Amino acid sequence: DTYTVGEAPAELYTDDILESAKDTTAIVVLSRDSSEASDYSTNMKDPNGDSFDTPMSISAYEKEMIQLAKENSNGKVIVLINSDVPMEIQELKDDPEIGAILWTGLPGMNGFLGVCDVLSGDVNPSGHISDTYATSSVSAPAMTNFGLYTYTNASNAESGAELTEADKGDW
């Protein structure tokens, strides 16, 4: 199964659209969705068929859109993460031209009214979510259990010798 992000390629943004962004703060929205039995695909593609770096990374089209926003705004770019699943956004965090990143989750019909309050400065989102996301999927603690491991006491088991309690470990 292939999952695509519905971002348009940069060439579809007309001069009129780009001109309308001049002297404004650009707001870029990156979205992902998932649901039961519809998690991340291992085959993430842009609409033109280009693969993502990883299933959680930002697509090439999204990177182009962010670059256009930086080039055609007043230099202030805010990225909204409209997603209920983790995304790898370290490159956004490290980009000095990104002024703010706000995770909105999936706020439903009225939740973006609260997002508008944050963007206008009426509310300060100083709280923290209880979830912690790894900056890279391979740095997540669960990944330490993946891989091929060699056991030093494997020869005992192969020879038919009975394992001692010390060999069995405290499982």
Give the positions of each predicted feature.
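C-terminal non-catalytic regions of proteins with extracellular/luminal or membrane-system context
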Residues: 1-171
